[in-house]
Amino acid sequence: MAGRTYRRRFLLLGGVCLLLLLGSMLVGRYGLSAGKLLHMLWARLTGGAADWSVSDEKVVFAIRLPRIAAAALVGAALAVSGTAYQGMFRNPMVSPDILGASTGAGFGAALAILLGAGYFGISLSAFCFGLLAVAAAWLVSRLSRSDPTVALILAGMMISSLFSAGTSFIKLVADTQQQLPAITYWLMGSLSAIKAEDVRFLVLPVAVGLLPLFLLRWRMNLLTVGEEEAQSMGVRTGALRLVVILCATLLTAASVAVSGMIGWVGLVIPHFCRMLFGYDYRRLIPAAALFGAAFLLAVDDIARLVTTGELPLGILTAFVGAPLFLYLIITGGRRHEH
């Protein structure tokens, strides 16, 4: 019975995600009918004649499609990353930035903007510094003789603080006319400048990060029972933790490199997935990917609809995510009382 319920929920979530993918193609100031959109997509898939205007071609395939693909990939990546980190650390308050990937990426982007790099250079710098931040946290934690998990969290907090201070210093010395506004806007997160090249940049690291987590999701259940219990079952917990950290970091760094710093997705979505699909990571990982993609697609649609000048996604996810998280805290407390 429970298995049938979960299957229905997966089908519903997948259907919502598909509807949002198609519906998002219609959102924007440039008017486009659903029939025309479906005709264009079908013709492109089947190699049919392109009997539409140049404007339609540009809006659908050069502007909206890359943006929607990026929103789905970033949402899925951040949600799965948060789910993996929360399971590994056995802490529901953990977010994808726990080890400094987001702040490291933010520093890398700010540095690239300060040095006058182009759009791809900014993304590449953000990606590399995101990975560097987590690598530094991991190396520092290995030097500690205290509990490995606690040492890793503390090292991540320290590295994150250092990169945050570095970003603040860059903002202090940046040109106030061009560089400072560019840094500030990038740090707030947005998909408004996404191009097809960004999606191609994003696909590989997201795929490399998602695939091992998907294949090892049943082993991740064993991490939640504790270190000694997992080892007694024959699980090499050290190697498994390292793989989870590498994959989750890759997902976070790649997402932030393309979209900027978008918070709350990796913190809130795993909670909703546990409410709907339980604590089994065999269901949680794919559910988080679908839920995260749907959530960021919806938020990005709101960003395009609310004002003529788009709101940064980081602001909107905070406006939406914070009340939802507060609701989860209150209802969770009531469930424990009863």
Where are these regions (language model features)?
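Alpha-helical transmembrane segments in inner-membrane proteins
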Residues: 1-338
